[in-house]
C-alpha cells in the first residue's frame, strides 16, 4: 500500500459531495493502492451537520478497504488539517433575485476564509480543486488568501465542460469518447467558455476534416456545451451533481497520477500564455506528470477563437475587478 492521503471535501453533505465521497473512498481518485482519510466540512447548522453524519454512516456501511478514517466538522481548521488534497465543493448558490455581483460577494467571504484556513493548517504541497461556482474566481480568491502556499496548486474545474464537449463530438462523429484527443475548453466555467476542437483528433485523424462545418460549431456545438448545465436543471429540476463529481474525479486523478501525454482542460493560474494576464485562473489545455501540470504552448489562435477567448477573458476580468477590494 502507498502512503495515506488526507482529502478535505467542503459541502460534503450536498448533492455533489454525496456523489463524490463514495468514489474517492473506493479508490477512483488516488488509485486502488492508496488509503484515504476523508475530512468533511459542512455548514455549522443542525440540519447540515445531521445530514453529514448520515453520509458518514453510509460511508461506514460500505466497508471500503481503502477508507482509513473520517472526520466530520463545521470548522475549516479541522477539515483542512494536514490535507494533501482539498476539494472546495461548497459555495453559496444563486438565490431568487440575486444579482451575479451579490453572488460573487457572498462567495468571496467563503473562499477568503477557506483559503486562509488552508494557508494555516494544510500541507504545504496541498492540491486544491474548486468546484463551487463561480469556480474560476472562487479559486482565485482562495489562492490570494493563501500566500504561503504554491499558487500553481489552486485550480478550478473545467473538466465537466471538457467532458460535455467530448460527448457532443463523440455523438456527432459516431466515435467512442476514448478515441478523441486534444480537445480544449478555454476560459471561465460559465456560459462564456469556449470549447475548441481545432486541434482535436478521433482515431488520430483531425476532427476538422470530418466536421468542416463552422455553422454547426457556432450554432450547435458551442451553445449546447455552454448551456448544458441549464438544460440539466430544466430537465431534472436540480443542477448537475453526478457528472460534476465525475469530472472532479477525472481532474484530480489526472493531475495526481498523470495524463499520459494526453491533453486535458484545467482551470489554472495563467503564466501569461495566450495573452491571458498572469495569475488569472483560466481554462487551458494542459498535460500532467508527477503531480504537476504544464500548459500546452504556442497553439495558433484564429480570429474566430480569439473572439470567444476575449469574451470569456472579459467576463473573468470583470469578476476579478468586483472582488479585488476584498483581498488582502
From Swiss-Prot:
- The catalytic activity of this protein is classed by the Enzyme Commission as 1.1.1.37
Question: Record's superkingdom?
Answer: Bacteria
Q: Which InterPro entries match?
A: L-lactate/malate_DH, Lactate/malate_DH_C, Lactate/malate_DH_N, Lactate_DH/Glyco_Ohase_4_C, Malate_DH_type2, NAD(P)-bd_dom_sf
Top EC class of this enzyme:
oxidoreductase
Report keywords, A-Z. Answer: NAD, Oxidoreductase, Tricarboxylic acid cycle
Which residues are NAD(+)-binding?
11-17, 107, 114, 131-133
Spell out the Gene3D superfamilies in the cross-references. Answer: Lactate dehydrogenase/glycoside hydrolase, family 4, C-terminal, NAD(P)-binding Rossmann-like Domain
GO molecular function (one):
L-malate dehydrogenase (NAD+) activity
Residues annotated for substrate binding in this entry: 94, 100, 133, 164
GO annotations under biological process? Answer: malate metabolic process; tricarboxylic acid cycle
Q: Which residues form the active site?
A: 189 (proton acceptor)
Chemical reaction(s) catalysed: (S)-malate + NAD(+) = oxaloacetate + NADH + H(+)
Q: Which family does it belong to?
A: Belongs to the LDH/MDH superfamily. MDH type 2 family.
Q: Which HAMAP family match?
A: Malate_dehydrog_2
Q: Which PANTHER family match?
A: MALATE DEHYDROGENASE
Q: What does this protein do?
A: Catalyzes the reversible oxidation of malate to oxaloacetate.
Protein name, per record: Malate dehydrogenase
Q: What is the lineage of its organism?
A: Bacteria, Pseudomonadati, Pseudomonadota, Gammaproteobacteria, Lysobacterales
Amino acid at each position: 500500500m502507498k502512503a495515506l492521503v488526507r482529502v478535505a471535501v467542503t459541502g460534503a453533505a450536498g448533492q455533489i459531495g454525496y456523489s463524490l465521497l463514495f468514489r474517492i473512498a473506493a479508490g477512483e481518485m488516488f488509485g486502488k493502492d492508496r488509503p484515504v482519510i476523508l475530512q468533511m466540512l459542512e455548514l455549522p447548522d443542525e440540519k447540515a451537520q445531521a445530514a453529514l453524519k448520515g453520509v458518514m454512516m453510509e460511508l461506514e456501511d460500505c466497508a471500503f478497504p481503502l477508507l482509513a478514517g473520517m472526520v466530520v466538522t463545521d470548522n475549516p481548521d479541522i477539515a483542512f488539517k494536514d490535507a494533501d488534497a482539498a476539494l472546495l465543493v461548497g459555495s453559496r448558490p444563486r438565490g431568487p433575485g440575486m444579482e451575479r455581483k451579490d453572488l460573487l460577494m457572498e462567495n468571496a467571504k467563503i473562499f477568503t476564509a477557506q483559503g486562509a484556513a488552508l494557508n494555516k493548517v494544510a500541507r504545504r504541497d496541498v492540491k486544491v480543486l474548486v468546484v463551487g461556482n463561480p469556480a474560476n474566481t472562487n479559486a482565485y480568491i482562495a489562492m490570494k488568501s493563501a500566500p504561503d502556499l504554491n499558487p500553481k496548486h489552486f485550480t478550478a474545474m473545467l473538466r465537466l465542460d471538457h467532458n460535455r464537449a467530448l460527448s457532443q463530438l463523440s455523438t456527432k462523429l459516431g466515435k467512442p469518447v476514448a478515441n478523441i484527443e486534444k480537445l480544449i475548453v478555454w476560459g471561465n466555467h460559465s456560459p462564456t467558455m469556449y470549447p475548441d476542437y481545432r486541434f482535436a483528433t478521433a482515431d488520430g485523424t483531425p476532427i476538422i476534416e470530418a466536421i468542416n462545418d463552422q455553422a454547426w460549431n457556432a450554432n450547435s456545438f458551442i451553445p449546447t456545451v455552454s448551456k448544458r448545465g441549464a438544460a440539466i436543471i430544466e430537465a431534472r429540476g436540480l443542477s448537475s451533481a453526478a457528472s460534476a463529481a465525475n469530472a472532479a474525479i477525472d481532474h484530480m486523478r489526472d493531475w495526481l497520477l498523470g495524463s499520459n501525454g494526453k491533453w486535458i482542460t484545467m482551470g489554472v493560474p495563467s503564466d501569461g500564455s495566450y495573452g491571458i494576464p498572469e495569475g488569472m485562473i483560466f481554462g487551458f489545455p494542459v498535460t500532467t506528470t508527477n503531480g504537476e501540470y504544464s500548459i500546452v504552448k504556442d497553439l495558433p489562435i484564429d480570429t474566430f477563437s480569439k473572439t470567444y477567448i476575449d469574451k470569456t477573458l472579459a467576463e473573468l476580468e470583470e469578476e476579478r475587478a468586483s472582488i479585488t477590494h476584498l483581498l488582502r
